Amino acid sequence: MKVTMISVMMPAAENIRGTSALPYHLLVGRDKSIEVILYSYNLNRLSKEQIDSVARELNIKIYILPVPWWYVFFLRFFSPFRILLNYPIANYIRLSSSQLDTIINDNPDAIWIYGEELSRVSHQLKDFRRVHTLPDCESLYYYRMLGKRFAIRNKIRFWRSAFMYPKYLNMEKQFDTSSNIHYHLVGKEDVNFLKEICPGIQAHFLRHPHYQVAKPAKVISFSSPKIKVLFAGQYNLYMQQDADMLIDCLIKSKDLSELKEHYVYTFLGKGWDNHVERLNNAGYETHHIKFAPDYIEEICKHDIQITPICIGTGTKGKVLDAIANGLLVIGTWYALENIAVKHLESCIEYGEAKECIKFLKDIPARRNYYESIALNGRKSILERHNQKLISECLFRFMKE
């Protein structure tokens, strides 16, 4: 089978300035008899050396599509102009007649579109079987954001969400509902929300493939004398509210001496300086790593990952990485959404920060029990978020 892929992002083994890892790992898992030609706008700005490396690793041909001059011009000089548009600015991107002719004349068996905003490009190729990987429903993201009190408190964030929400709604209402196009998302609620917006659409939830797994696999046995706890990811909008609440609880906990005795905390990512300083001042052993050259190697040095995500859609890649590599993940509902794990069987889910503290108190006394949860989590991810399995499901849509 020959597939032509058109993508806003250049695939990469890890997310580089965008969601570039998902298409990479779907391509890694494909049947090797499937020939893929990729046309990419390379909005995540990979270098020529990186692009050549990706082409070799994935055994695909890659052609760069020039980003339209008007897109660059408006983003650079007239960014506020976007407020007046009915749709997100990237949704106005279309293939030129020569680009379209090249793809049509190549006569692929199917077209694979990556990036929600490329729906007009998809429509230009409406005579082909198509799969459109979104991978998230952006209108759901803004809908959720507008329902959060912390978003309303920040005027810039609130008005951005208020302006972007109807733009994505307008775009998604216009999605093609023909029988020869399937939409692929990595969130169950994303699919449900999209089906409400656009009745009749063929939208499907496929689990997000996990990324890298350390070799040899990490031995799941909590460190002694102190258990190593990791906070991974930048301190940003997605973690801000719940991370602040959790740090406050750690500092003000009546069990402070017990928590200090049994744990060492590491923050991996930028923006955590204030939290590290506050925990150190409270007597906790705390470390800060702003960047790890080998991310998987670094996370495997730890036993537990706490993920206090308070907003978002789809699947969180760093949570998948942690569980797949044998860490016990303690996270919020948003952190664990769409991941094939269950509370107290293969992960720990908490609602309020004080619940997380309760589990941290219990873990040192029942190490074996919580190690078994981490073991079950890894087993579930490796089986149900398997690259090959999910890639087979995706490419099957291209034959229907």
Predicted features along the sequence, with ranges:
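N-terminal subdomain of nucleotide-sugar transferases
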Residues: M1-K61, D106, I251-S257
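Conserved catalytic-core segment of nucleotide-activated headgroup transferases in glycan assembly
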Residues: L22, H208-N280, H288-Y295, C300
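A short, active-site helix/loop in glycosyltransferases that binds the activated sugar's phosphate group
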Residues: E49, R120-S122, P166-Q202, L394
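Membrane-proximal helix-turn-helix segments that form the acceptor-binding/catalytic region
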Residues: S97-T102, E138, F150-Y183
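Acidic donor-binding loop of glycosyltransferase active sites
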Residues: C300-G314, N325-L327
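Short hydrophobic beta-strand element within catalytic cores of glycosyltransferases
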Residues: K318-D321, L328-T332
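Conserved acidic donor-binding segment of nucleotide-sugar-dependent glycosyltransferases
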Residues: C347-K354, D362-R367
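A charged, aromatic-enriched C-terminal amphipathic alpha-helix characteristic of glycosyltransferases
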Residues: A365-M398
